[in-house]
């Protein structure tokens, strides 16, 4: 009977350890995913900002060409 208790305790302990490791890996992968999404969002906002400046640049160039 004592052997069964020890075996059961060992199985439960190893199960908890593996569950803890899996949860930690899952948490890390979610953090990496969130960081990746934030980086993508930042890149898109920079692209939009630059695209918004194109009409201004075109109008400035045309104004300069009219002067010269």
UniProtKB/Swiss-Prot annotation:
Record bears the keyword Manganese: no
Locations listed in the record: Secreted
Keyword check for Secreted: yes
Tissue and organ distribution: Expressed by the skin glands.
Cellular compartments per GO CC: extracellular region
Extent of Acidic residues compositional bias: 31-41
GO biological process, any: defense response to bacterium
Superkingdom of this protein's organism: Eukaryota
Keyword annotations: Amidation, Amphibian defense peptide, Antibiotic, Antimicrobial, Cleavage on pair of basic residues, Fungicide, Immunity, Innate immunity, Secreted, Signal
Similarity comment: Belongs to the frog skin active peptide (FSAP) family. Medusin subfamily.
Misc: The primary structure of this peptide is identical to that of Phylloseptin-L1 (AC P0DQK9) and of medusin-AS (AC L0P329).
The protein's role, per its UniProt record: Antimicrobial peptide active against Gram-positive bacteria and fungi but inactive against Gram-negative bacteria. Also inhibits growth of B.dendrobatidis zoospores at high concentrations. Shows anticancer activities. Shows hemolytic activity.
Protein name: Medusin-AS
Source species: Agalychnis spurrelli (Gliding leaf frog)
Source organism phylogeny: Eukaryota, Metazoa, Chordata, Craniata, Vertebrata
